[in-house]
Amino acid sequence: MEKKKLPPLSVDVAKVKPLVFGEEYESRMILDHAITGRDDVIQINHGTVKAGYALGGAAHEEDEIYYILSGKGKLQLDDEIIDVYGGQVIFIPAGCFHALDNRGSDEDLCILTFWRDWRFNDAYEARLKLWGKSFKTIDED
């Protein structure tokens, strides 16, 4: 079966409305099946863990990749805790519990998260519930 041909797409992250989870985390969906119009596209989220906060963590049914854009923090991977910093890529296999901790820093920890299936992302579901779609610009209500 031939894949649906898509036009090139550019997304300005600064113009994507964040979904805010309390004071600790902001999530911006910057690429997904709804934006591109094709179900098999890689999902990309821009996340910011605010300085002084930690996230609860989860284990997913799909592999996930973190690319640390900036900042420093800790990442729990099952029973191991590693230091994370800008420029680092972390592969998180399916079933691995992972949690980001930015409590020891005075700067935000910014990451890109990549995964295959949009159905395995809690923030995606929260966006649909709140906005009726996965992506909003800052110019929308």
Question: Which residues fall in each region the model found?
Answer:
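Conserved short histidine dyad/triad with adjacent acidic residue
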Residues: R28-H33, I44-H60
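Short beta-strand His + acidic residue motifs that chelate non-heme Fe in jelly-roll/DSBH
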Residues: G56-G57, L75-Q76, I92, H98-S105
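Glycine-centered loop/turn positions within well-structured domains
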Residues: D63, I82, H98
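Glycine- and acidic-residue-biased ligand/ion/polar-headgroup-sensing regions
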Residues: D63-E64, I68-G73
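Short acidic-glycine-tyrosine-enriched beta hairpin
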Residues: D79-G95
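A short hydrophobic beta-strand segment most commonly corresponding to one strand
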Residues: F91, D106-Y124
